[in-house]
């Protein structure tokens, strides 16, 4: 049994093929999806989507969105997505360190929220780049 996975961003279809298993980062934590999963609609957090095709794992950084699972079909609508192969690990590491420093120094509610979003984005990109 397989899952039909389609990941769509506003400007492109990022992934559209059959997979064996996926692991999603939702607002309430990570969930694994296997064939014959119960129907589900989930809000996605900024994080990593892990995809298993046969014995190979792939990853992509997702920048929030929604996932709909029904009848072995998974449709993921995201604000932005980057495949791990599109991310430079060294650049992702530098961005993460910069975001971490900015978060530690952020003062005021607005600056803290902005720094936290930048940090979560950088963390997702770094995690995705190291899974390959």
UniProtKB/Swiss-Prot annotation:
Its main location: plastid. It is found in: Plastid, Chloroplast thylakoid membrane. It is a peripheral membrane protein. It comes from the Eukaryota. The keyword Cytoplasm does not apply. CDD domains: F1-ATPase_delta. The keyword Membrane applies. Produces ATP from ADP in the presence of a proton gradient across the membrane. Belongs to the ATPase epsilon chain family. This is ATP synthase epsilon chain, chloroplastic. The gene is atpE.
